[in-house]
Structure formats: structure tokens, C-alpha cells
């Protein structure tokens, strides 16, 4: 169910290109060279494309840190099986994860895994709640179930960058925290001047770990479709029970904490929608004011 839809950009009245065409024309994306070195599903950003990717990441990190009291972490990209079990990736999604058999370690599909496991087997003090954690990571997904889906360009890749937001909160406050998590992510989309919508997932579409989830989608005019760029979820005590993450409540009793997470945001589809939305008829890309301090240019041409 669509709960918010915000379309403020004027419809482009020229021959609109998709991100693959724009990337090739401006020499900022090279999927052919990436495929030569790694196979399909791996992007190669170059020149001002690499600059834009890095600017998006740094802008997102800085925005959340400056405005919402997050603590930043730079976590391992490899985790043990029990860490992936805590957050719900194992055993159900083992086929979608890259596994290093010799060391029995998994490449993380999201920094949610490592951020949540910071407090595995901990008892947190009520005085120190809520805890807001942020982490940038590369993310790795085999996309084993992607047959028949649109995998062109940046739409579905095996390696991508993402800024992740994780919260540890008192149970009675977790749904208010979910609403604020969604707002924090959509604020980024507003500042990037992208059209977007927020979808509340029905029970049948929820992951087995989540109690409630909102998906954020951006409009990509070159693709002529909505692209999912974030999921914001309240897991209630699902992850905390698996990871034995507890807190002492106001009565002095020990109880399981509620965990939430959201992408704030994942970059590949943001990158695609960004260059499609801000393309000009002359082939250049306009850079919104929010990113100009990070790129020190006002356009890519």
C-alpha cells in the first residue's frame, strides 16, 4: 500500500536516456570492463562517476551523523555463521550469500548483520537507550533468485555500497522509532531532489524476521519504473532473541530489546535514478546543491 508519493520534478520533454546510455555517453560507467574482470552483475564507476558514487556515500553518512545522533562504525565485511543467524540471513537465505568455505565466513549482504551483532549476548542499560548505529559497507549478494528479473546495469548487482542504520530501542518505543527511520531516509531523497514513494508492506510480503516494513522507491524516468532503494523494518524481538540481546527495564527486570534497521541508503539504484532524473537535453547531468560541496562541480558533462 502506497502511504506517501512525492513527485516534484517536471517531466523531461526530450529523448530521455536510461542510466546505461548516460553512463556510456559521459564515460562514467563501464559494465564491459567490469564483466571482463569479475563477470556480470558488477559495476565499474570511473572518473566523475566514481566521484558521484563517493559523494553520495559521504553525503548520506554526514547527513545522518549531523542530524540524528548516530554513532558511526566501520565493521568487518566477513562474519561468522552465528552472526548471520542472529539477523535472519541464515539459514533461510544461505543460497544468496557468498560463503568462504575454508574459513567458514560469509560476506555480508548488508552492514545490518555486523552492526546488530555488536551487542550479541549483551545486557544493555536503560540509561544508554536508545542506541543509534550507522555503518557504511560494501554489500555482497549472489542474487540467486533473480532469474527473469531486470538485471541490466545497476538495477540488480552482486556488489554495491550502502549506508545502513540500526537502532536498539525499548519495545514500547519501537514503532515511533520506525516512523522516524523512514523519515530520515526520505529526507535524503528530498535533498537529492528525487521523486519517491513509500510503501507499507502487507503481511504476506514481509520477511519472516520483520514485524512491520516500509519500502522506499525512487522514480527512474529513463527506465520508466519505480526502483526500490531502501527497506525500513521493525524486527521487534526477533533478532534480539536469536542474538540474546537484552536490556534492564525500568522495573529492573531483564527483557529482550527491539531492533530496527533501514537503508539510508543503498547507492546503485539511487545512482541510476539520480543521473536519469537530473539529465539535461545536452547530455549533461545537473548536480543538486546538496551534493555540490562533495563534488565541487555543478554538473557532469
Model regions: which residues?
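TRNA-recognition modules of translation machinery and tRNA-sensing kinases, especially anticodon-binding
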Residues: 7-301
